[in-house]
């Protein structure tokens, strides 16, 4: 009887040790991606599974879902800020201006691509997006020469959760002497409390 008890104790010990090793292996196998939420990780797993099955439509949908989650986490960002030749632009389709020099009275067109804005679904089923903006002009000493709050307000709607959005602001300034100046533009997201500011230098010749 004593011998059986010893064998039983050894079996229990081995079983417990195996269980512990299995738990350690499970912990080691768990992917570690700092900042990635559980929901995003689940969707990324779905993406990988769909890709492995060559179900590219499902994989694309999963990627879009991750991007939508990222959009909610991200602050408002202003990407690809540049001077362009006119105000008629769409996302990624514009004519870059080769120079940042302007004659007095020239219209200045500034293109940018916002990221992380709110996109809220309305009762109609459309996603509603909106922005407002303030602007100011500074000289090379940092002195504010003028500006305007809410100089632009824009609203958009789409049947899809849109992530390819561009804004083009038109600035008409007068009374500036020859020299170097800075346009400071603050964009506010209408659907949240997110804001972002960009600065762009130009010269009057």
Can you annotate each of these PLM segments?
Residues 4-13:
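Sec-dependent N-terminal signal peptides
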Residues 29-205:
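Intrinsically disordered, low-complexity terminal regions enriched in Ser/Thr/Pro/Gly
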Residues 15-17:
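C-terminal motif of bacterial Sec signal peptides marking the signal peptidase cleavage site
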Residues 19-21:
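Bacterial signal peptide processing site
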């Amino acid at each position: 009887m004593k011998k059986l008890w010893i064998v039983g104790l050894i079996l229990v010990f081995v079983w417990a040790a195996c269980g512990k090793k299995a738990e350690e292996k499970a912990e080691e196998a768990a992917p570690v991606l700092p900042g990635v939420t559980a929901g995003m990780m689940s969707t990324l797993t779905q993406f990988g599974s769909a890709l492995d099955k060559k179900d590219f439509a499902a994989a694309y949908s999963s990627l879009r879902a991750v991007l939508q989650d990222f959009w909610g986490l991200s602050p408002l960002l202003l990407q690809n800020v540049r001077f362009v030749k006119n105000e008629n632009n769409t996302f990624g389709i514009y004519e870059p201006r080769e120079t940042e020099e302007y004659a007095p009275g020239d219209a200045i067109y500034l293109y940018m691509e916002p990221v992380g804005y709110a996109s809220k679904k309305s009762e109609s089923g459309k996603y509603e997006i909106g922005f407002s903006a303030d602007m100011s002009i500074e000289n090379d000493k940092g002195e504010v020469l003028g500006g305007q709050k809410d100089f632009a307000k824009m609203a958009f709607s789409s049947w899809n959760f849109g992530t390819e959005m561009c804004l083009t602001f038109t600035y008409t300034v007068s009374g500036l002497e020859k020299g170097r100046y800075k346009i400071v533009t603050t964009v506010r997201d209408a659907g949240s409390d997110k804001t972002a500011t960009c600065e762009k230098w130009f010269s009057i010749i």
